[in-house]
Amino acid sequence: MLLGTFNLTLDNKNRISLPAKLRSFFDSSIVINRGFENCLEIRKPADFESYFQTFNNFPNTQKDTRTLKRLIFANANLVELDSANRILIPNNLISDAKLDKEIVLIGQFDHLEVWDKVQYEQYLASSESLETVAERMKDAK
């Protein structure tokens, strides 16, 4: 499982190093895609296929389904980890997530989120409390 928060630096070639604690979770490749709230998401290829099925079950006759699938999957990339366990982040995703040099990697149990540090700090500052969100979600399934 993927847990924790890691502060990383994006190098000159748009790569981040996968923290040692997380390396055993991944094989030699990952899928990186556009996420919500201006972050990126990293998954194992098999987990990405399961993620895709969630959206593929929505009716393709609805415009919102087609739009959501395009926005997420058109920019998804299968990326090989290099020998130093670095992930190359494609330029289009760097732009989408507004990534600068300082990056925050956040474990989300089954995937990782990649955030620009300033964007993530702004997100946290404007977020509601844990209790408020949990209360509102009590009936969600």
From Swiss-Prot:
Keywords: Cytoplasm, DNA-binding, Repeat, Transcription, Transcription regulation. The keyword Transcription applies. It is found in: Cytoplasm, Nucleoid. GO terms for molecular function: DNA-binding transcription factor activity; transcription cis-regulatory region binding. One of its GO terms (biological process) is negative regulation of DNA-templated transcription initiation. GO terms for cellular component: cytoplasm; nucleoid. Its main location: cytoplasm. It comes from the Bacteria. Disruption phenotype: Probably essential, it was not disrupted in a global transposon mutagenesis study. It holds the Pfam family MraZ. Residues 5-47, 76-119 form the SpoVT-AbrB domain. Belongs to the MraZ family. Forms oligomers. This is Transcriptional regulator MraZ.
